[in-house]
Amino acid sequence: MIWHVQNENFILDSTRIFMKAFHLLLFHGSFIFPECILIFGLILLLMIDSTSDQKDIPWLYFISSTSLVMSITALLFRWREEPMISFSGNFQTNNFNEIFQFLILLCSTLCIPLSVEYIECTEMAITEFLLFVLTATLGGMFLCGANDLITIFVAPECFSLCSYLLSGYTKRDVRSNEATTKYLLMGGASSSILVHGFSWLYGSSGGEIELQEIVNGLINTQMYNSPGISIALIFITVGIGFKLSPAPFHQWTPDVYEGSPTPVVAFLSVTSKVAASASATRIFDIPFYFSSNEWHLLLEILAILSMILGNLIAITQTSMKRMLAYSSIGQIGYVIIGIIVGDSNDGYASMITYMLFYISMNLGTFACIVLFGLRTGTDNIRDYAGLYTKDPFLALSSALCLLSLGGLPPLAGFFGKLYLFWCGWQAGLYFLVSIGLLMSVVSIYYYLKIIKLLMTGRNQEITPHMRNYRRYPLRSNNSIELSMILCVIASTIPGISMNPIIAIAQDTLF
């Protein structure tokens, strides 16, 4: 009899929870319609994989790419709508959040065709790879719109767990296992530090978790200048620092870049930075509104260390992927300038513009590395010597993307850095911008060193990998080359027509 009553209570409680969830989805589902498309795509992937054979592999790629494109389309249709807060204050929809969501979706859309041939050649499990990519994308999108501390913690964990699994996808590779272990340990530690910072913020504000309510709570409790807020700021900066990977929180980055599968590195190198930057701007700008001088100082130190250490250590690298790892550490230093400048002086607009260009430059470079790695089995820089004589198209594409990363005119990277540094200079960050300009010159050196090797490799420099390199024609059915061409075009042409891109970025300011 007692068991029967308990069973009835359990059914009633479960029904209430289900009805509440259905009610929330029914009345608030339109606010997360792009995310719902991805969830539907994930369900379709699972259904097809469990009911079909290996002959339906093209359908898996088609469903993944289509769901991402449809999600982008849904975002574009929602453009310029009034800002809305949904799900009891947990999620916010506005243009600023949506453009970061657009950038994450764009990264994932370009990374899937970049991965097709690599997965086929390495015989990796396809369905799980696509599931992890879409789930990580979903976590990044929720992080961009997160409006309370719980969602800000849960969403990046969704992204991070998939990232750990993707980085260790080649289970038989010792380097991949080592990279995954370091990534997992560092990620777990950073999440713990972040939550500890949130607990100080929660207590100081009188038990508030929504970002704007935290500000009101700090005013009511008169705790906005208390030591507790300073402690919260330090812990949260460290926690976010591990996600953004500026120096000195970059220890995991080179090993993960070198040991993980190259398409995974391409995906993580851009999506993680876009999602973390979106979260950082909201956390620093809203709850720490009264501590702007303190977090500006902390971020300036991180930016200077990142630009100096990242670019100087990149000079000494012999692996292309490790070189790009340290290059990305330097690049995040430039992005932090935009975060510091903030809403005034077009700081966020310059950061968004540079991130858009960085996505194309970085993914284009990784597409070249994937192609070269599949054809030679190496990513050592010296093995690229003389590539122009064997494959002019791949050599020219690599050179254009590297030059754009270095910031040489008239490529997109130059105008992106120019806009970012100009906004920083107008905001009075003279020392920070000067360091950025100096380190940009240093970065041009090691990029040009690789380009020189590509174009003019001497006979004594050419390795057996290059001597055995077979000429490959430009094939329209090669998805990696398609991604590479799109990224190369996006790394060059937008530099000539900057005004429309800047205007769109300026419209995203909240």
UniProtKB/Swiss-Prot annotation:
It is found in: Plastid, Chloroplast thylakoid membrane. The keyword Heme does not apply. It catalyses: a plastoquinone + NADH + (n+1) H(+)(in) = a plastoquinol + NAD(+) + n H(+)(out); a plastoquinone + NADPH + (n+1) H(+)(in) = a plastoquinol + NADP(+) + n H(+)(out). One of its GO terms (molecular function) is quinone binding. The keyword Transmembrane helix applies. It is a multi-pass membrane protein. Its main location: plastid. One of its GO terms (biological process) is photosynthesis, light reaction. It holds the Pfam family Proton_antipo_M. The chain crosses the membrane at residues 24-44, 57-77, 99-119, 124-144, 149-169, 183-203, 229-249, 295-315, 323-343, 354-374, 395-415, 418-438, 484-504. GO terms for cellular component: chloroplast thylakoid membrane. Keywords: Chloroplast, Membrane, NAD, NADP, Plastid, Plastoquinone, Quinone, Thylakoid, Translocase, Transmembrane, Transmembrane helix, Transport. NDH shuttles electrons from NAD(P)H:plastoquinone, via FMN and iron-sulfur (Fe-S) centers, to quinones in the photosynthetic chain and possibly in a chloroplast respiratory chain. The immediate electron acceptor for the enzyme in this species is believed to be plastoquinone. Couples the redox reaction to proton translocation, and thus conserves the redox energy in a proton gradient. Belongs to the complex I subunit 2 family. This is NAD(P)H-quinone oxidoreductase subunit 2 A, chloroplastic. It comes from Piper cenocladum (Ant piper). The gene is ndhB1.
